[in-house]
Amino acid sequence: MRHGQTPSTGKVLPGRAQGLHLSDAGHQQAERAATRIAELARVDAVYASPLERTRETAVPIAAARTLKVQIDRGLLECDFGDWTGRELKELTRLPEWGTIQHAPSTFTFPGGESFIAMQTRIVTALDRIRARHPGGVVVCVSHADPIKAAVAHALGTHLDLFQRIVVSTCSITAVAYGTGAPVVLTVNSTGSSLAELRPS
């Protein structure tokens, strides 16, 4: 799932900047998400990226199961390099923005990470976490672009199409992994019950 809302959501590209916490609305989102996730029959582990906004989102989810939030750097936001902290209204005017939207597989952020490297990192992290909890139910709190990239990979969709996926703050995306191909159970879920969530 994606972290909750912050004071800069939709305004700047925060990337991996430290010290960005959930807003009051973000904390409320996290509590509602924790209530929804509590509907699941089991949760074996809760992971988050090292950033404050993901850890704060994960805390109520873990607390409901008396679990500790485990940190995995593979769940980090894309490294936006020199673009970190810049206003989105400024970035959207750059010619590179069109590449990011339509051919992200060809783009590397100046001084930062490529979208391909980000996708490889998040997929590797999820594989590693799954190996630690075979057959388990695990909640991973991450960031919009890594989640979208992971969904694209699970669907077998080219990375250049991943911007067609929407991942809202505190939305839940569920993927079932078994012996065959991954099965995407839900994407960007913000309100429906999770109680019956399972592969058909």
Where are the language model's segments positioned?
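Phosphate-coordination/substrate-recognition cap region in phosphate-metabolizing enzymes
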Residues: 31-98
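Acidic, low-complexity terminal tails and accessory targeting/binding regions
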Residues: 42, 78-89, 131-136, 153-200
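Active-site signature of alpha/beta-hydrolase-fold catalytic machinery across serine-
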Residues: 60, 149-153
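Extended, charge-rich low-complexity interaction segments
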Residues: 99-111, 195-200
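Loop-to-helix element that buttresses phosphate recognition and phosphoryl-transfer chemistry
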Residues: 2-61, 108-123
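Short active-site segment of divalent metal-dependent hydrolases/proteases
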Residues: 6, 146-147
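Short basic (Lys/Arg) and small-residue
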Residues: 143
